[in-house]
Amino acid sequence: MGEGLLVRRGLGGSSDEAAYWWAKYTTDKVFIGYVGSDDIDEYPEAGEQDGYYYELQKKTIEGLTWAEINTLASSGIAKKLLSVGDRKSITLTTNEIIYVKIADFNHDTLSDNTTAPITFIMEDCFKATYQMNSSYTNSGGWKSALLRTTLNSTIYNTFPSDLKAVMKTTRKKRYNGGGSVSTLNTVDDKLWLPSEMELFGSASYTGGTAEGTLYPIYTDNTSRIKKVNGSANWYWTSSAGGSDAGGFVLVDGYGRVSGRSANSYYGVSAGFCI
């Protein structure tokens, strides 16, 4: 039997749906860790085998630690055991509680040019609204945006340490703004915002299609609606307006694409990779 983690059956889209894990102990019941195999039928229902004691335990995705989720990710079996749409809560150091969902598996590129096993995106937005920039400009695009700096400093610092310990640096391609899509920047972030392409699978406001591909969690306008303090609200994407030197692309309160001035205040729904 291989060392690692094993979910007996896949988790559904609910944080309350249980999964089963094999815990490994010495015969004196000293906990060793969890065990995993692609062939779950080789495990006993419980009891001693090969000098160890095994116990079947119930868990939910809400009950998994970020270290356990990271182990699933690094083992290469996360896609078999978790599902797009699985939802988990995060309590920030400010005591604000946010919820994230699995947006996809093996979708994003990390800063070392490997593939991220799991991408999470917030279900809704932070309680506070933010400007993309302090003035009416999108020069430099997401790479130069004030909100990018805020997201990866002030906001990032409010995330719990166990999550920050396993959060990877994600590499995104974003246009440079200035009313043109002639220049594409490489941007490496721990926290980031999805692009118009990643949310809609099209780029009617961005004007260029090189900013990633659609996350399967977004299937229609309803799936793109996000709330600020309990009410549907507009929120930022990381896409600069392709024909406007001062605006960024947003999602409106009905889940439709739109655009607004960079110095306006709107919701922020961040993503990250494990």
Give, region by region, the residue ranges found by the protein language model.
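Exposed boundary/loop context
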Residues: 3-6, 26, 44, 246-248
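Short, low-complexity N-terminal tether/leader segments at secretion or assembly junctions of large
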Residues: 1-20, 28, 32-35
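Collagenous Gly-X-Y triple-helix signature in extracellular proteins
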Residues: 44-274
